Each structure stands twice: as C-alpha cells, then as structure tokens.
Amino acid sequence: MIKQTKDFAEEVQVLAALLQALDGAAWSEPTQFKQWTPDQILRHLHCWNEAADWAVHAPPAFQARLEAGRAHARRGLSMRDFEQVVVNCNGAALLERWATFALGMAHRWQLLDPRQRVKWAGPTMSVRSSLTARQMETWAHGQAIFDMRGRDRPESARLLNIVVLGVNTFGWSHQVRGWDTPAHLPHLVLTGPMGEMWTFGEVGVSGVVRGLATDFAQVVTQTRHLLDTTLQVEGEVARRWMLNAQCFAGLAETPPQPGQRHKALRGA
C-alpha cells in the first residue's frame, strides 16, 4: 500500500471534522487566503481531486476537465467560476461530495505503483507525487479555514510528506522566478509534530533553517510569512528561499505579507 494514501485520507478527515461544525453563513465567509470562502476552497479541492483521480482511472475525463478549464480561462473567466460550474453545490452537500470522493480516491490508489507516471496540467507526475500534491493542497487550503475559525490543526507525522515536497521544490522556487538555482540545499533541522527530528541538506554549505516542521510547511505553502513563524534562518541562500518559497505549480506567486495570514482571535 502507498503510505501517502493513508496520509491523504487522514488530511481529508481532519479538515472534514472542522467543516462539519460550520453553519450556513460560515460557508460564505471570506478567509484570509485571497478572500476565498470555505465553499470556494472545497470546490477547488474537489474539482482537482476529481481531475487527479481521472488522470489515473479515466484519462479521457481528465483531458476533458483540463481542456474545459483552459477554454474557460481563454474567455477571461476565473477558475473560481469554472469550479462552481463543475462542482455545483455548496455547504453540507459540498462537504459530503468532497469527503466521499476524496476518501474513495485514497482507497482506489492504495495498490497503484507509486512510480507510475500520470498526466497533469504541466509535466507528468508519479502517482506518489500526485497524491502528495493533493494532500498538500488539502493541508494548505485547509489552513485558511482553520485560521478563520481560530483553531489549531491537529498535526501528525503525515506532515513529513509536505516537508519533503517543500525540500524537493527548492529548485522550482528559484526557476519559477527566473533565478539560477543555488548548487546546494540549505541544511534543515526541523522538529516534527511528535518531537521527531527531520534533517535535510549538507551542513555548512548554503546556510541553515531551524525550527518547527509546521512552520516550514506553512512557509513553503505560502500560508504564512517567514516573520510570522519561529524559524531561525542563517545565510543568504536560506533566507532568500524562505522569503520566496513555493512548493506548488503554476506561475510565481507572491507570498503573504507579514501578519497577513494568521489564526483569528476567536473561538467556535
């Protein structure tokens, strides 16, 4: 069984537990992530979970979804509009549709070859990478809803997948901005949610990043600015990376400003 299937399912269940407590009005409340609402976030996740699953099990459906999205964009319409068209529900019904499909997807992918190549919007990806990307999307977009509700997310060792994705996109974070990639990854010394020590990179070559793995994951997914974390960063290469990290595909995105994304000071 691919370990990432269990981790993806757990990520879905953690977010679903939070969403089950939302009332009708909260589903249309803007979050700190580009003012997206929980409805918009869940439509986005479900739309592209379907696409990822179809890329493996129904390639013609995947290609049709991709081409429809591109045609929508060529007409000058937003992806949020497109996602609302193809995922035409909201609130509790949307939660049920998203969670049921995502958990079913995790089950369907258990026995796949993790090295199998599958199509995506850009270059092909391995099954393992595709599933990790879906977990990362769930975790990163879910952060906006946890922040909106003033809650801390229960983390676990599943976070390592997102940390590794952040490490593996060190080069991408530079390339997407047209910068040369430094020859060496900074040394990372990260503390996992259960006190684990996760280390990457060579000592004494390109600086160092020390701190909580959760903070590192928030920086590479752009859910927090570096200054809103407790990460300790030494060296020019390490600091430039942490100020511009981007572990997801697409065009270069500007990370949030200091203080822009944070946990709301409220309960419920």
Where are these regions (language model features)?
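Acidic interhelical loop/turn segments
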Residues: Q20-T31, A102-L131
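Glycine/small-residue-rich hydrophobic helix-like segments
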Residues: R177-V220
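Short, helix-capping/interhelical loops that line the mouth of catalytic, cofactor-
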Residues: M1-K3, E50-L111
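Hydrophobic packing residues in well-ordered alpha-helices of helical domains and bundles
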Residues: T5-F8, L95-W98, L131-R134
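An N-terminal domain-cap segment
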Residues: M1-R43, A52
